Design a protein with these regions (language model features):
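Conserved GHKL (Bergerat-fold) ATPase module
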Residues: 1-475
Length: 475
C-alpha cells in the first residue's frame, strides 16, 4: 500500500500489551536503554530515543523577587533526542587504528575488571568466511575461575549485533578466562547453544582462536609469561586431560620448579635437555608444598643419581600426570609409584632380611600390601610406595578433603636395610622373635613413613608414647 511520507525510510510501530506483575515494562526508559546497550551498542547507525530530562531555566527567563531570589522553579522538564548506542566497535577497526587507551577502556567494559590486560589479540580472519576477533588475556585470575557456574569471557556478535555472552562454544573450558569478542557476519542468526555446537563456522572459529592464544603465549618473554603462568597456570593444566588435539602444545607451556631449579621454573623441554646421559625418564612427585617434596625420602635415590625431579604442588597436577604419560618420547615417571629401577637390590641383603620382612608384613597386613627392601631410600629408614597405576597419597588426600570416597588401596612399606636402626631391629628379631618391642618397631616404621609424606596418623598418641619411651631408654 502506498502512503504519503515527508521522509524516506521505514517506520515500525510496536503495540505492547500491558505488562503483568513480574514482567519487564518495555516502555520504561531504563529497560529500553539496557536492551539497546546490551544488544545494539555497536551497530553503525545511531539509535535515538526521545527522553525527558531536566535542564536549568535560562537566567533571563527566571522570575525573581525584590530580594533577587528566584521565585518558583529554576529547572524545567524538556523532551530531547538522545543517542543510546556508542557505535564504537573497536574490533571492526584496523589494528593500527585502535589506541592502547581504547583497548584498556573496552577491556574493562566487557570484563568488569579494573586491571589492564596482559596481552591483546586483534585480528581479522579472511577467506571463505570472514570474521573479526578481539581477545584479551587478563593480568589477574578471577577469584571464581574454577567454579562450574562461572561465565566465560567471550561474546558473540553478528554484524555488530550482540548474539550472546558466556559463549562457551568459542573456546574450550580451560580458556574460559579469556575476555573478548568475535563478530561473524556469516553466522546463522537462527542460533542456539545446540546449533552453535554443531555449526561448522563456529568450530572453525574456535580452532583458530585457540591457535592464536597459543601463539601469543609461546611468544611471550619469559618474565612476562611467568607472571601470567602464576595466575593462569592451573587453567592451562586443566586443558591437558580435556584437549587431546593440543595436549603436546599445552605441555610445552607448563612450568615447574624442580629439585635443582631453586626459585626458577623449568619447562619440560629444558628438563629433557638437562637429563643425565643414563637417564631415560622424566621424574615427578606430587604433594602439598615445595618444602615437603624437596625433603621427601622418596627422592633420596634420585638425588643420589643427580637426577632432576619435577615438583608438582597443584591439585590439578594429579590429573596432568594421569593424562600425560609421556612427552617427546620421554615417559613421565612418579617417584612414589612403581619400581624406579635405579639400582639392583643386593641379593645377599635381601635373603638376610627376608625373615624379618615377612614378620613385619604379618604384623602390618591390615595397613600395607607388602614390606620390601627399598631402592628409593638412602638416609631415611622407611617410606610408602604404590604400584605403577595406583593412586598417589596426595590424590587420596584431595579426594578425602573434597568429601569424595578414596579407593581403599594398600601400598608397600619400603625399608632401608642399610639403616643402623634396621640392623638393630634385625638383631632383636634374631635373638627373640616373640619380643613385644618388635610390635612397637613395626608401628614406628609405618608411622614414620606416613609422617614423612605428610599423612595423618591413625593413633598419634601411641606414636608419641613410643617415641618418648625410646628416648627415655636411649638416655
Amino acid at each position: 500500500e502506498e502512503i504519503d511520507k515527508e521522509k524516506r525510510g521505514t517506520q515500525i510501530t510496536l503495540f505492547l500489551k500491558d505488562p503483568e506483575e513480574g514482567d519487564q515494562d518495555f516502555t520504561e526508559e531504563y529497560t529500553i536503554r539496557h536492551i539497546v546497550k546490551k544488544h545494539s551498542d555497536f551497530v553503525t547507525y545511531p539509535i535515538i530515543m526521545n527522553v525527558e530530562t531536566s535542564e536549568p531555566i535560562p537566567e533571563n527567563e527566571i522570575i525573581r523577587g525584590k530580594d533577587g531570589k528566584p521565585i518558583g522553579e529554576t529547572y524545567r522538564k524538556v523532551k530531547k533526542d538522545e543517542t543510546l548506542n556508542s557505535m564504537k566497535a573497536i574490533w571492526a577497526k584496523s589494528k593500527d587504528d585502535v589506541t592502547e587507551d581504547e583497548h584498556k577502556e573496552f577491556y574493562k567494559h566487557i570484563s568488569h575488571n579494573w586491571d589492564d590486560p596482559c596481552e591483546i589479540i586483534h585480528k581479522k580472519f579472511e577467506g571463505v568466511t570472514e570474521y573479526d576477533v578481539l581477545m584479551y588475556l587478563p593480568s589477574k585470575a578471577p577469584f571464581d575461575m574454577f567454579r562450574a557456574e562461572r561465565k566465560h569471557g567471550m561474546q558473540l556478535y553478528c554484524k555488530r549485533v550482540f548474539i550472546m555472552d558466556d559463549c562457551k562454544e568459542l573456546l574450550p573450558e580451560y580458556l574460559g578466562f579469556v575476555q573478548g569478542v568475535v563478530d561473524a557476519p556469516d553466522l546463522n542468526l537462527n542460533v542456539s547453544r545446540e546449533i552453535l555446537q554443531e555449526d561448522r563456522l563456529v568450530r572453525n572459529i574456535r580452532k583458530n582462536l585457540v591457535k592464536q592464544i597459543f601463539s601469543v603465549l609461546e611468544g611471550m618473554e619469559d618474565e612476562k609469561y611467568i607472571q601470567f603462568y602464576e595466575e593462569f597456570g592451573q587453567a592451562l593444566k586443566a586443558g591437558i586431560p580435556t584437549d587431546y588435539d593440543n595436549k603436546e602444545r599445552l605441555a610445552s607451556l607448563l612450568r615447574y620448579k624442580t629439585t635443582k631449579s631453586g626459585d626458577k621454573y623449568v619447562t619440560l623441554d629444558q628438563y629433557i635437555e638437562n637429563m643425565k646421559e643414563d637417564q631415560k625418564e622424566i621424574y615427578d612427585i606430587t604433594g602439598e608444598n615445595l618444602a615437603s617434596l624437596l625433603n621427601s625420602p622418596l627422592l633420596e635415590a634420585l638425588k643420589a643419581k643427580d637426577y632432576e625431579v619435577l615438583l608438582m604442588v597443584d591439585p590439578i597436577d594429579e590429573w596432568v600426570t594421569q593424562s600425560l604419560p609421556e612427552y617427546k618420547e620421554k615417559k613421565l615417571k612418579s617417584a612414589e609409584k612403581g619400581d624406579l629401577d635405579l639400582e639392583k637390590v643386593d641379593d645377599e641383603k635381601k635373603n638376610e632380611y627376608s625373615a624379618l620382612l615377612s614378620f613385619l608384613k604379618g604384623k602390618l597386613e591390615s595397613k600395607v600390601k607388602d614390606v620390601v627392601v627399598s631402592k628409593r631410600l638412602k638416609n631415611s629408614i622407611s617410606c610408602l610406595a604404590g604400584d605403577e597405576w595406583a593412586m598417589s597419597a596426595y590424590m587420596q588426600k584431595i579426594l578425602k578433603a573434597s568429601g569424595q570416597k578414596a579407593p581403599d588401596q594398600k601400598r608397600a612399606l619400603e625399608v632401608n636395610v642399610n639403616h643402623p636402626v634396621m640392623e638393630k631391629i634385625k638383631s632383636v628379631f634374631e635373638s627373640d622373635t616373640t619380643n613385644p618391642v618388635l610390635t612397637d618397631y613395626c608401628d614406628l616404621l609405618y608411622d614414620i613413613a606416613v609422617i614423612s609424606e605428610g599423612g595423618k596418623l591413625d593413633n598419634p598418641s601411641r606414636f608419641s608414647a613410643l617415641v618418648g619411651d625410646l628416648m627415655a631408654k636411649s638416655i
